[in-house]
């Protein structure tokens, strides 16, 4: 992972606290490596499911 990818992952970790899965998904598009895209995608999916659980959708 590049330094830029590490910064994107750190930003996504901050966004996870606010259940902002769509913004994390946008960061996924900015990632430079496949590994970073995978990590960010997993974070977006996890955040989406946490948001659903918090809203009692599941």
Map each language-model feature to its residues.
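Short, charge-rich amphipathic interface segments used for partner binding and complex assembly
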Residues: 19-58
């Amino acid at each position: 992972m590049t330094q830029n990818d590490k910064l994107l992952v750190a930003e996504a970790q901050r966004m996870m606290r606010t259940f902002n899965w769509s913004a994390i998904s946008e960061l996924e598009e900015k990632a430079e490596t496949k590994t970073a895209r995978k990590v960010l995608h997993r974070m977006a999916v996890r955040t989406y499911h946490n948001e659903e659980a918090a809203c009692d959708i599941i």
